[in-house]
C-alpha cells in the first residue's frame, strides 16, 4: 500500500483508549482476540507461559509486557504457534501484523 501526501489526518487532542490497558496476572496461557485491550501488562507468577496473538489482520498491533518480578518468561506466539518474542521479567514487545504474519518491531 502506498500513502499520498494529500489530506493528512490530524488529531488536535490527546488520544484516550478507554479500556485499552489490561493489567492481569496469568496462571495459564493467554489467547488474545481483537476484543482484548491493545496493551497487555501481564504478570506471570508460574512457569513459562504463552501469550497467543489473534489471527493475522492487516495493520493490527498489540503491546505486551511481562510484569513478573521473577524469572518466569512469557513467550509471545502467533496463531500457528510460531514464536514471535520471548519476554523475560520487565521486558515488553510491540507486535504488528499484516494479512499473513506477526512481527516484533520493538523489544526490550
Where are these regions (language model features)?
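Tight coil/turn sites that cap or link beta-strands
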Residues: 37, 88-92
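Exposed extracellular interaction/assembly regions and N-terminal maturation sites
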Residues: 2-76, 98-108
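Short, surface-exposed secondary-structure edge patches
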Residues: 53-54, 84-86
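Short edge-strand/loop segments of extracellular domains
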Residues: 78-84
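Generic beta-strand structural signal
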Residues: 88, 97-98
Amino acid at each position: 500500500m502506498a500513502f499520498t501526501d494529500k489530506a493528512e489526518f490530524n488529531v488536535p487532542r490527546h488520544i484516550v483508549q478507554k479500556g485499552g490497558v489490561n493489567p492481569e496476572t496469568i496462571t495459564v496461557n493467554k489467547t488474545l482476540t481483537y476484543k482484548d485491550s491493545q496493551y497487555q501488562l501481564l504478570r506471570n507468577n508460574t512457569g513459562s507461559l504463552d501469550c497467543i496473538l489473534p489471527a493475522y489482520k492487516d495493520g493490527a498491533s498489540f503491546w505486551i509486557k511481562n510484569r513478573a518480578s521473577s524469572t518466569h518468561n512469557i513467550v509471545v506466539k502467533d496463531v500457528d504457534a510460531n514464536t514471535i518474542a520471548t519476554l523475560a521479567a520487565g521486558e515488553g514487545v510491540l507486535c504488528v501484523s499484516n494479512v499473513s504474519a506477526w512481527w516484533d518491531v520493538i523489544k526490550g
